[in-house]
Amino acid sequence: MFRKIREQISVQLSLKPRRVVLAAILLLNLAFIVISAFVISLLSVSGTEEMGFWQSAYYTVMMVLDAGNVAEVVGDVGTAGLALIIICLVVVIVGMVLFTGAVIGYLTNYISSFVDNANLGSHKLYLSGHIVILNWNSRASEIINDLLYSDEKKRIVVLVQDGKETVEREISERISDTLAQEREGGLKNKLTVIVREGDTFSTKQLMDISIDRASSIIILGNDASSTTCKYELKSKLEGHEKGNPQVIKALVQVAELTGAQSSADDQKIIVEVEDDWTHSLVKRIIENKQVDGKCNIVPVSVNKILGRLLSQFSIMPELNLVYRELFSNKGSTFYSLATDEKDEHAYRSRLLSDNLCAVPLTVMEKDGAYTEYFCAQSERDRFREMSSPVSDINVSLNKNYWLEQRNVIILGHNSNIRDIMEGFNSFRKEWNHDGNEIMNVVVIDTKPNLEKMDYYRDYPYVVKTVEADVYDRDKICKTIDRFVDANDQDTSVLILSDDSVTATDIDSGAIANLIYVRDVISRKKRAIPSFDEGKIDIVVEIINPKHYDIVKSYSVNNIVISNRYISKMVTQLSEKDSLFDFYQDILTYDDEGERESKEIYIKKVLRYFDEMPPDCTAAELIRAVYRASSGDELAEEERTETVVLGYVKKNGKMVIFGGDRTKTVVKLENTDKLIMYSNH
């Protein structure tokens, strides 16, 4: 019997030590009170002979709690028996140890343990409608930062494998920087961010952060360049090229939990994908695990999106300024709403006539449901109707308008280079005509990287490749100088940041190449004072946002912080996953002869119009251009259905139409460029 009791205690001590200790404390105190009460009742003095067991027990407890209660039992010390006095003193002393010490010690330990567990994040969170971020990379803090500009309060839970304190510090620094920059605008922090450290594949830990009640779940990939060790970096890069099984594992787990009948409806799962193998498996998971009405899985192809963006920025550098705002929650941005409208021409015409603030873009159909897309400063702007009709003006468009040849120098490389070239291919298919080549590209890179791309022989528009590393200053400068002189049109210099280097070397090569390009411009300016610096458009990609000020000091307007674009897109998709199809559309040019896809273009005012438009309001300009580009009298190949979104001045100042369009005065000049949404 004793052996079985001892075995049971041993098992319970291993499974639930805290409960066993508490039970032992209670039993010892109970035994002590019973024994003390029995002895005191036997030794009661004159006047307390009637003190029974329960009264003795009561006084025992009172003496333990307050030693002054000894007087209630002893009475007059002179007449009390020595034995009773000694017993009472023993009760007080032993009680202080057994009761006060043990119980207070236990409670102190329990509270301390509770606080530690809370800091470690091991207790369950009871939340709903929150955003969950699984894993951490260089884009994660930008996702949280962009949510600062949301109209609503947001609760975000981050679950990472390790480095909780580092993540918390990074979030705090990023938010503090933004709040300091936006102090004049009155931006307030409406975010509640909880960071937890644990196993992102654990069902229990995922349920502990109420993943089944979240509005959105964002699954991030890992950074290969986060290490400072070259050998570790090489191993990570080799793994990244093959695929990312961790993302797949996390997605399967999340899809299972969010697809359950008990989970919340319409949950959005945004998953970063960086390679074809992972993307193909994500597609299969969507086919087998996605439950309509429960969870919608949206794969974000990081390299393809960055490649398309960088190719578009090379072709039209001002697009960087445009997308920087439109892909953000700050200022004017893209919105989507379910609609019964099926005809996009009728939709645009109606909204341009009736609405005050929203700029209509398109209507898209998916699975029998229709969604309208518009540009505005707030979703509420969609429902602000005009109080009075807008006057109309007439504009004359250049019916023979065609984009000029694009001259591009690619300086350096990154992991998105093939996707950048695919972006050029897509652009050529839409804009090459009559045997004329729209693209004219020179690539300057190291010999190993050029060999890896087979010296760009698959791309007939690459007219020259130059072997040079970051130390070949003269060769780089001479190549740029000669290419600029050989072409009458502007030249875009796309400076890429190598993302296959260690964390300490990130952006170093890009900054060195930027210095070389600025030297070329400075020398030309000294030789020919009238040289137009705008003839060389510098587009610099950086990976680490902390290097922004360094690059900006070289008078560069088009700084592409590549990670921020993905972060901004992920943020918007986490709130409106229907924007995914729209983004796919504007980032992809049509094949030759097709005009179904619509993109955002930058077009020179002087070439786009036959005559300069008069000074007018934004509302008048948008309506006039749309009528002139979509009229029934136009031939099909002339009908572009163009919606003007804003314009860019020669000095780089950008205006995107937002708010009350009737109050925005537009005075276009010959050197201005229009921002427009069009099918060609």
Feature-to-residue mapping (PLM):
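Cytosolic regulatory regions of ion transport systems
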Residues: M1-H680
